[in-house]
Amino acid sequence: MARVKRAVNAQKKRRTVLEQASGYRGQRSRLYRKAKEQVTHSLVYAYRDRKARKGDFRRLWIQRINAAARAEGMTYNRFIQGLKAAEIEVDRRMLAELAVSDPAAFGALVRTAKAALPVAPVAAEGTAA
């Protein structure tokens, strides 16, 4: 049976891991075992944070929309409710962009949302609402 030589493959594997670990501090960029552990962990972080980034941006957009809506005298919750009632389908990313770059257009959307909201009945005095 022929002898199997794997030195080239092993060296290539180690070189690849050490290249991925370049820029890390200390042993994590120089020693193969430490570098392999750190590269694996880094890839896990990268995967997790790619997923988390989507939620982070959504939270940022909601904060921007809420701030702009409150400047117009309306809360975020009522604003979104009014947009749904007016059958306006604009995603939060575009609403946040409008709030930052074109406040006049955002104000028009707020007025439309206010007009579409039903007026809440006023509770009679002395009764719990």
Swiss-Prot record:
- Recite the UniProt keywords alphabetically: Ribonucleoprotein, Ribosomal protein, RNA-binding, rRNA-binding
Picking any one GO biological process from the record gives: translation
Q: Which PROSITE patterns does the UniProt record give?
A: RIBOSOMAL_L20
The family database entries (Pfam families) matched by this protein are listed as: Ribosomal_L20
| Any GO CC annotation of this UniProt entry | ribosome
UniProt-recorded Gene Ontology molecular function terms: rRNA binding; structural constituent of ribosome
Q: Where are the membrane-spanning stretches? A: none
Which SUPFAM superfamilies does this entry report, sorted A to Z? Ribosomal protein L20
Keyword 4Fe-4S annotated: no
The record's similarity note reads: Belongs to the bacterial ribosomal protein bL20 family.
PANTHER family cross-referenced by the UniProt entry: 39S RIBOSOMAL PROTEIN L20
Role this protein plays: Binds directly to 23S ribosomal RNA and is necessary for the in vitro assembly process of the 50S ribosomal subunit. It is not involved in the protein synthesizing functions of that subunit.
Q: What is this protein called?
A: Large ribosomal subunit protein bL20
The organism encoding this protein is Kineococcus radiotolerans (strain ATCC BAA-149 / DSM 14245 / SRS30216)
